[in-house]
Regions:
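Non-catalytic DNA-recognition/assembly elements of restriction-modification systems
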Residues: 1-18, 143-182
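A generic structural signal for short beta-strands and their flanking turns/coil linkers
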Residues: 29, 47, 93-95
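A short beta-sheet element
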Residues: 34-35, 53-116
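A short glycine-rich beta-alpha junction/loop motif
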Residues: 74, 89-97, 109, 129-158
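Well-ordered mid-protein domain cores that form the structural environment of catalytic cofactors
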Residues: 117-121, 145-147
């Protein structure tokens, strides 16, 4: 089957970004995630700031993260991605792209792997802006071309990649455990 190319905002249900506000850190409440907390296959919640429930509600009213959304670091460190697999999401995000899929796991997994592709990385690199701190404009994320095969081919490719990612995550967890024991 032939592949087609569509814009990210046509493939996703919505492409948005997290808050640009800087809520005052609190001693408890909800976590506020930024690009530096994205570690690929997990989020480093330990180093994230707490924010008030009021600030959290204000942020998620605009850009709530849901299961199968992809977080994309778009300021500073560019291109780190995280696929939210949990049905319960209790954090807000700041200064990062959010590719939303309205619960469509198939499309989310395809986009997750596509964002790791040389084509996507080249597109992102060619759309960087900023002299002091690099960033990718939200409009560029929305307009990003996404190559898509037919559904059967897409699912076959994802079914080959998912077990490899799971093995990598398992090995990382083992390594982390060994480092803690040393």
């Amino acid at each position: 089957m032939a592949w087609k190319t569509v814009r990210a905002d046509e493939f996703c249900s919505f492409v948005t970004d997290g808050t640009h506000d800087s809520p005052k850190p609190q001693s408890q409440g909800r976590k506020l995630i930024t690009s530096k907390h994205l570690k690929g296959d997990y989020i480093d919640f330990d180093s994230a700031n707490w924010i008030s429930e009021g600030d959290y509600q204000k942020i998620i009213a605009r850009s709530a993260v849901e299961q199968w959304d992809i977080l994309f670091s778009m300021i500073g460190t560019i291109g780190t991605i995280y696929l939210e697999k949990s049905p319960i999401v209790e954090y807000a995000c700041k200064n990062m792209g959010v590719f939303k899929f309205a619960g469509n796991a198939e499309n989310a997994f395809w986009m997750y792997y596509y964002l790791k592709s040389p084509q996507a990385k080249e597109y992102i690199q060619s759309h960087l802006r900023g002299s002091t701190q690099a960033y990718v404009p939200l409009g560029s994320l929305r307009e990003m071309p996404v190559s898509i095969p037919d559904r059967e081919t897409r699912n076959r490719i994802v079914s080959l990649l998912k077990p490899l990612d799971e093995k990598i995550a398992t090995n990382r967890a083992i390594n982390d455990n060994l480092m803690q024991q040393a």
